[in-house]
Amino acid sequence: MAQLTIKKKLKIVLGTFVLKIVVRLLWATCRVQPVIGEEHLQHILTNKTAFIPCFWHELLIFGAYYMRRLQKRGANVGFLVSPSSDGELGSQLLNSWGIQVIRGSATRTGAQAMQALYTVIKKDGVCPVNNPDGPRGPAREFKVGTILLAQLTGAPLVPLAYAAEKAWRFRSWDKFVIPKPFSRINIVVGRPMYVDKKLSKDEQEAVRYAAQTALNETLRTAESRFNNLQLSNAQNERPLDGKNNNCDDTTR
């Protein structure tokens, strides 16, 4: 990573402080409902087995919230963060929560990132959070790299999702979700998926598609708790105001 200037360091410190307050405010005010499917993790947590938590990039805010909850129950949680200066803000925020940071980029240093993830899983029992459609999309498309990591390590993939009763959505590639304060939040845990070490290309593609389907089904289960209205339904989205083209409002 390039040497940070004093100005850049100050921006990171201030940005981390502000972001931490905003996230904490959302975590504190939103009403998280009893987690659906949490029994799927009981055996894994009891035996302190490393696993690979997977949720779509758009769901980072309460995906991170749930990983913090699992961390308090003994899971050795980790996040892959870009080694660039842009990733420093996220790194500082995660460090402030006591979450392990693995520096690497799936797009720029893919092989090195895979090696780093393999090492922390096998050596330290880390559960590295994975956004299988990140960092740039396409949205909700499960990339094969996550399947390869599960093959190499033997760690199961665990699908996770949440849905917010009321939320804003950024008009970014992933339609990033910002739950509104005091909204109800449904979190769903899917069944762990174990991946065979030896797969043909066709078999690997079948597993990739099955994982993508499982992740989408997990999200649909979370959304179905709100009168079967999907968070991604464009009919339920409207501009926050007439001048704002960067964020949509989703209300159930």
Report residues per predicted region.
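Residues at the C-termini of beta-strands that transition into short coil/loop
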Residues: 36, 83, 105, 161, ...
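General small-molecule cofactor/ligand-binding pocket signal
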Residues: 33, 102, 188
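A short, well-structured juxtamembrane/interface segment
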Residues: 24-50, 62-63, 68
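Non-catalytic C-terminal accessory region of glycerolipid acyltransferases
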Residues: 2-21, 25-30, 42, 92, ...
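Catalytic core of membrane glycerolipid acyltransferases/transacylases, capturing the structured
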Residues: 49-108
